């Protein structure tokens, strides 16, 4: 009887907090959360999508709405009651994946790189700085002072509760170092290597009628890095396939790092050199899958299969495809992500790393592609830079996917795969968007000395 009374009491409490006025962004059940996220992404009726196409491209394009749906160029979802709903970003994505609409032939990722893009790459390639072994070119570098902010507007569903907040922190790598927390709005706990997602955790009680503000200020030094193709080919060695390290980074991690051995071997043919295999896969992806605005990652069952099926993908989706293909070929690869900090282009970004025996970890930005239409557009090193190099405009906080946050989160994460915006929850549920806002603010950048590493 006591159990029945307790259950009734808990039900009453839940009803008081989670009544009819509960905002859609307050998530208590994982399955319902994913369903609501799908509804949020697929929010346009066919007629609304047609109207949006007319606004963007004119009546002649809008008249072909059903044709674009049939071709898979407008992503749709059929609801349980039989209604066809269109992905909210699909109309704006159309010009990115359909040259007939844009009027511009798409060539490959990176083909449209401009002089400022090339200048960033050349500054790394031409840097006189190198490691002790003279093949890891590290430089230029910069020290970045930044502020990360999370603001949670007041809502009655939060009343009397405590907000738990996780924010990204730069992770120490061969390219990121001298990381420090300068100040914070609340006492904090750092994950300190206990998760693939590097975080700072804070909590604070909700004050009735008032927004809750969290922030911290930090600084770190980040360097660019480049390994020439000649150095890789001259130093590469066979993998020790019995080593635990090798197993760790060639193992599949379903549902988003999966066996694509058939597809990968079709790309590489008879090539046996791991670097040249990597280069063939990189070019294949860069040449075939244009960038397009993404759905919430948490609603996609298998990221690399999504790219193969849809014919396009954002930075994280093509990176996952690349990592899956590398591991399927027995080449160690891993995820890295956070933010890109290029002048005038502060945004979330995902990339990868590949491991070559005799060299070590080499950064790979699949989304940036090969600069210029052909290697001769600029030069070979500039053309293929991002297949074995990276710039200094990075804030990397993740070296893996789908990890457990520290301290552990109780409810479903807003970002179930990656970790860039942060996470917020209470004792009663997860806060999804737009229940809170976060931002990364760059306070100051200064040229920095480059740390030297004898090996990785």
Q: Residue locations for each model-derived region?
A:
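Short loop/turn segments at secondary-structure transitions that flank enzyme active sites
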Residues: 171-173, 220-226, 291, 358-360, ...
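Active-site neighborhood of thiol-dependent amide/isopeptide-bond enzymes
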Residues: 269-351, 355-357, 372-375, 379-387
């Amino acid at each position: 009887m006591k159990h029945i009374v307790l259950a009734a009491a808990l039900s009453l409490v839940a009803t008081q907090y989670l009544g009819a006025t509960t905002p859609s962004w307050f998530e208590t059940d994982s399955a319902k959360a994913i369903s609501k996220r799908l509804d949020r992404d697929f929010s346009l009726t066919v007629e609304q999508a047609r109207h949006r196409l007319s606004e963007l491209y004119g009546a002649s394009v809008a008249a072909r709405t059903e044709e674009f749906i049939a071709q898979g160029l407008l992503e749709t979802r059929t609801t349980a009651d039989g209604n066809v709903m269109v992905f909210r970003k699909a109309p704006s994505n159309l010009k990115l994946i359909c040259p007939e609409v844009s009027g511009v032939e798409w060539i490959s990722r990176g083909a449209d790189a401009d002089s400022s893009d090339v200048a960033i790459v050349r500054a790394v390639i031409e840097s006189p700085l190198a490691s002790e072994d003279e093949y890891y070119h590290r430089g230029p570098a910069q020290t970045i002072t930044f502020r990360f902010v999370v603001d949670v507007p007041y809502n009655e569903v939060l009343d009397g509760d405590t907000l738990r907040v996780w924010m990204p922190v730069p992770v120490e790598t061969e390219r990121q170092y001298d990381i420090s927390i300068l100040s914070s709005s609340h006492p904090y706990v750092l994950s300190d290597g206990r998760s693939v997602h590097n975080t700072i955790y804070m909590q604070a009680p909700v004050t009735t009628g008032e927004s809750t503000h969290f922030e911290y200020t930090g600084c770190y030094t980040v360097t660019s890095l480049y390994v020439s193709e000649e150095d890789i080919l001259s130093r590469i060695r066979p993998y020790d396939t019995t080593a635990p390290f090798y197993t760790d980074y060639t193992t599949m991690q379903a549902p988003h790092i999966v066996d694509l051995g058939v597809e990968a071997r079709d790309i590489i043919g008879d090539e046996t050199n791991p670097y040249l295999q990597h280069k063939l896969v990189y070019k294949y992806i860069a040449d075939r899958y244009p960038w397009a605005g993404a759905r919430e990652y948490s609603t996609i069952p298998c990221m690399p299969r999504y790219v193969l099926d849809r014919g396009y993908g954002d930075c994280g989706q093509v990176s996952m495809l690349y990592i899956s293909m590398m591991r399927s070929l027995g080449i160690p690869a891993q995820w890295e992500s956070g933010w890109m900090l290029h002048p005038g282009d502060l945004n979330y970004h995902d990339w990868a790393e590949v491991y070559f025996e005799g060299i070590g970890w080499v950064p790979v930005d699949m989304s940036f592609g090969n600069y210029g239409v052909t290697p001769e557009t600029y030069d070979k090193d500039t053309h293929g830079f991002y297949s074995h190099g990276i710039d200094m405009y990075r804030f990397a906080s993740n070296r893996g996917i789908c990890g457990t946050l520290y301290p552990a989160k109780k409810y479903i994460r807003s970002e179930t795969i990656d970790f860039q915006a942060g996470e917020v929850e209470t004792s009663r549920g997860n806060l999804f968007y737009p229940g809170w806002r976060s931002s990364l603010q760059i306070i100051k950048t200064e040229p920095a000395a480059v740390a030297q590493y004898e090996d990785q």
